[in-house]
Design a protein with these regions (language model features):
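Short glycine/proline- and aromatic-enriched beta-strand/turn motifs that initiate or cap beta-hairpins
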Residues: 19-62, 219, 226, 230-249
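Outer-envelope beta-barrel architecture signal
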Residues: 21-25, 67-73, 116-120, 152, ...
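Residues on the lipid-exposed face of transmembrane beta-strands in outer-membrane beta-barrel proteins
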Residues: 27-31, 55-65, 77, 104-112, ...
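Structural signature of outer-membrane beta-barrel domains
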Residues: 32-36, 78-82, 127-131, 177-183, ...
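Outer-membrane beta-barrel translocator domains and adjoining extracellular loop/strand segments
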Residues: 37-44, 83-90, 132-140, 183-191, ...
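Extracellular loop and loop/strand-boundary signature of outer-membrane beta-barrel proteins
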Residues: 42-48, 91-97, 139-146, 212-215
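Glycine- and aromatic-enriched membrane insertion/assembly motifs of diderm outer-membrane
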Residues: 46-91, 102-103, 117
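Predominantly the C-terminal beta-signal and adjacent terminal strand-loop region
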Residues: 146-151, 156, 162-249
Length: 249
């Protein structure tokens, strides 16, 4: 909530501070790699975290101070996955488990647009968990309670203008995201030595009562390629009463 209020305040102050600025809007969609990083899981030889994929789509509002500098506020629906391969034993074959977790992401980004059409963007992101499902074989179980409802992270991206006209254009880019906060909740085994993805005894077939030696945080990470369609919406101009107003193209 504080992040949203701060974002709105920054946007409103900016609107009243730059009389030659303009506002654009856009639609975007992306696809790429999504993973959950946990050092204990990644170092356990009987569990192989597989490279997993996800997708995202949504919209953006951008405040352009000039042709080079911009602040953007995105509203993104995202579906992420993490697949785990459990190694076989003498009595069981190898088997796979997948967790799909969906979120509503709001990144507030500073973007620098270069004169050659490329751009860089960086800033914080708050994510709101909207669902989580664990699938083993043909069985799917709701695991939303295993994960925290919010997560604060950071975004870094870059890309380039592809084609377009004066007010509408298409860009292509890569966006990297890392969540700073632990994604697991108490129900998922937070602060214990037996936590997701082995909190339901998945490792007992290898060693009865298996636990990790310590607790390590689980952090989301992703790298998605995006296509983004932008449209220049309106200029900010000073009215006769000294107020900043929008004048649409």
């Amino acid at each position: 909530m504080r992040f949203l209020l701060s974002s709105a305040l920054i946007f409103l102050i900016s609107l009243n501070s730059f009389s030659q600025a303009w506002v654009d809007c856009g639609l975007k969609g992306g696809y790429g790699v999504t993973n959950l990083i946990n050092t204990n899981v990644w170092n356990e030889p009987k569990i192989e975290p597989l490279i997993s994929t996800g997708y995202a789509y949504g919209g953006k509002l951008g405040l352009n101070f000039n042709i080079n500098y911009q602040i953007t506020l995105d509203f993104i629906a995202k579906s992420s996955n993490q697949r785990y391969l459990f190694e076989p034993t003498q009595t069981i074959d190898k088997w796979e488990k997948n967790v799909n977790y969906t979120s509503f992401d709001i990144p507030l980004l500073f973007r620098h647009n270069s004169d050659n059409g490329s751009f860089l963007e960086i800033g914080p992101q708050v994510s709101f968990l909207t669902g989580a499902t664990e699938t083993t074989g043909s069985n799917s179980i709701d695991r939303k309670d295993y994960f925290e409802t919010t997560n604060l992270g950071a975004v870094f991206g870059f890309g380039s203008f592809i084609f377009g006209g004066d007010n509408a254009y298409l860009v292509f880019g890569l966006r990297l995201h890392y969540g700073f906060q632990d994604l697991l909740s108490n129900a998922g085994g937070k602060n214990s030595n037996k936590y997701f993805p082995i909190n339901n005894g998945e490792m007992d077939v290898y060693e009865s009562g298996f636990e990790f030696n310590s607790y390590q945080t689980t952090n989301p990470i992703s790298g998605l390629v995006y296509l983004e369609f932008n449209y220049d919406l309106a200029y900010l101009v000073r009215s006769s009463c000294k107020r900043t107003v929008l004048r649409f193209f």
